[in-house]
A protein has these predicted regions:
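Acidic (Asp/Glu)-rich catalytic clusters
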Residues: 38-42, 63-71, 112-121, 148-151, ...
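Short, electropositive alpha-helical surface patch
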Residues: 58-73, 135-138, 171-183
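Active-site beta-loop-alpha junctions enriched in small/polar residues
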Residues: 7-9, 53-54, 79-83, 131, ...
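Active-site core of metal-dependent hydrolases
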Residues: 26, 152-227
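Alpha-helical scaffold segments that flank or form the walls of functional sites
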Residues: 3-11, 17-73, 101-121
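Active-site gating/metal-coordination segments in enzymes
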Residues: 65-69, 73-75, 79-156, 207, ...
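Short acidic/histidine-rich active-site segments
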Residues: 210-212, 242-248
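Glycine-rich phosphate-binding "P-loop"
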Residues: 17-28, 128-134, 157-162
Length: 248
């Protein structure tokens, strides 16, 4: 059993600057992760895909440590978050001097096939993200670069849709640029209860991922878990059960 979209650690971009009031406590993080990972093991889960982006607290050493402690397969990601909440300014600056799509392509391909920096740890999946109701030009650059990497290496792609929007557009851009639809999981689609919208996404042959169970209702401005389950049931009745993924 595999969970396709989880976060053992996560920090919104910029958290690294708050070492005074919000320092990282690794021992506390280990204890908290041991609690929920122990619960997963009771249900015979063996593999966890950690979808934390490069600039949002991704920590290959921590993931490797938790994999060893819990005797689980934990897969690390490579990629960036959606533009308003990420570190895109770095790439915007670099775009004045270089072909950033190619640089992003090389970065992700290297982290998948050689390793992340000098850690000796490889990523196993690409993680992309788009904004609420729009895909910005720089977000599209990342999608195109990931499609190129997938075409060459076969490594899978998982995505973040903000509030369940732009899923079909993500699938279109990725597949039009050569990505294999069977290796694409479009995430957070549980934020949308429009059955026709889900069918539009599924028409591309990609996976439709419902991965935010427990984060529901007015506090998170999302559908309830019951509404999400109703959507899954409706899609299964239409024959899409082989394209539906579920995670936390």
């Amino acid at each position: 059993k595999t969970l396709m979209h989880e976060h053992l650690l996560y920090g919104f971009c910029g958290f690294q600057g708050d070492d005074t009031l919000g320092p990282f406590d690794e021992l506390e993080a280990i204890r908290e992760n041991m609690k929920w990972l122990s619960g997963l093991k009771k249900y015979e889960f063996k593999t966890i895909v950690d979808a934390t982006n490069n600039e949002c607290g991704r920590d290959p050493f921590f993931l490797a440590k938790m994999a060893t402690i819990m005797d689980l397969n934990i897969i690390c990601s490579t990629g960036y978050y959606y533009e308003p909440a990420s570190a895109y300014m770095y790439w915007k600056f670099r775009s004045g001097f270089a072909d950033v799509e190619t640089e992003i392509y090389e970065m992700m391909k290297t982290e998948l096939t050689v390793g992340i920096g000098k850690t000796g740890i490889k990523a196993g999946v690409m993680k992309l993200a788009t904004s609420n109701g729009v895909i910005t030009p720089f977000e599209e650059i990342f999608l195109k670069a990931a499609a190129r990497v997938n075409k060459v290496t076969g490594y899978p792609i998982i995505t973040h849709t903000e509030m369940g929007t732009m899923g079909p557009d993500q699938a279109r851009i990725l597949t039009e640029n050569g990505a294999d639809p069977k290796s694409i999981s479009v995430g957070h689609m549980c934020g949308n209860t429009d059955i026709a919208y889900h069918e539009e996404l599924l028409s591309y042959g990609v996976f439709d991922c419902f991965d935010r169970f427990g984060l529901e209702g007015d506090l998170f401005h999302t559908p309830t878990d019951e509404e999400r389950c109703d959507v899954i049931a409706a899609l299964m009745k239409k024959g899409y059960e082989d394209q539906i993924l579920m995670s936390h």
